[in-house]
Regions:
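Aromatic side chains
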Residues: 50, 119-122, 138, 183, ...
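Long, well-ordered alpha-helical scaffolding segments within enzyme catalytic domains
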Residues: 36-42, 132-148, 208-234
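Catalytic-core regions of hydrolytic enzymes
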Residues: 2-132, 217
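Charged, glycine/proline-rich intrinsically disordered loops and linkers
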Residues: 59-83, 88, 146-180
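Active-site-adjacent mobile loop/cap segments within catalytic or ligand-binding domains
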Residues: 6-9, 19-20, 105-108, 156-234
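A structural motif corresponding to the C-terminal end of an alpha-helix
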Residues: 40-50, 144, 184-191, 229-230
Length: 234
């Protein structure tokens, strides 16, 4: 893909009003953290000459997203994100576009700390170009998150992580690394699309890493370098 043809669309996580999307101690709010990462990655990509957009920046729901229940509002929010991405696909060509939605995972929805951890990249089911985008992000994460990998191994000794945890959560049963799921924004967008789960918001050690400058920069480099590698290789 030619650099000048590439349209990179970064996706923020949820809304500020979405229930439960925060660490138990409320220090990390997924919607806020995701927007910070998206804005930084967007600025850096634009700085090196890539056309880059963000699907939805405000923390609050727009007038069109509002609904009688939280579920309706969430459905409207997801539809707005998909419509934004697909409008760019229609304008620039789906093969020139790519969508990277940036989230933080959670092991439970009980407002308690857990011992799960790790970085993962999700795609829709089946073999698509999204798999290639995911592979490139994983490959750069292996390099940039080496310190996180070491941190997890040490954390297993203290109980911060249980013994089954791995720094990179993958499903290699189909010959590649990406996890697969029926996420709406992956199934309904017309271009290669991935959803990146950056560690766990209900793991104390992960939250410390996510809130640190070192952690933020490592994750941003993983995503940015993965995108650039994808553009250069497809």
């Amino acid at each position: 893909m030619k650099k000048e043809d590439a349209i990179i669309i970064l996706g923020t996580a949820h809304l500020g009003s979405t229930p439960g999307k925060c660490s138990p101690d409320k220090r990390l709010r997924e919607a806020v953290w995701s927007r910070e990462i998206c804005k930084e990655v967007c600025a850096k990509l634009r700085g090196i000459g890539y056309k880059t957009e963000i699907d939805y920046e405000p923390l609050l729901a727009s007038k069109d997203m509002k609904g009688a229940t939280v579920k309706i509002e969430q459905n409207h929010e997801l539809a707005a994100r998909v419509n934004f991405v697909n409008s760019l696909c229609k304008k620039h060509g789906a093969s020139n576009c790519m969508y990277i939605s940036i989230h933080v995972n959670a092991a439970g929805a009980d407002d308690k700390w857990h011992t799960a951890g790790g970085f993962s990249v999700y795609t829709s089911k089946g073999k698509t170009k999204s798999d290639i985008l995911a592979e490139n992000i994983y490959d750069r994460a292996f390099v940039n998150l080496a310190d996180y990998s070491r941190m997890m191994e040490e954390g297993k000794k203290t109980g911060a992580y249980d013994s089954k945890q791995k720094p990179f959560r993958m499903d290699t049963s189909d010959g590649d690394k990406d996890m697969e799921a029926d996420f709406y924004v992956l199934n309904k967008t017309n271009c290669p699309a991935v959803l990146v789960e950056c560690m766990f918001q209900d793991n104390k050690a992960d939250v410390e890493f996510l809130l640190s400058d070192e952690g933020k920069h490592a994750i941003m480099r993983s995503i940015l370098e993965g995108i650039v590698s994808y553009v250069n290789n497809v």
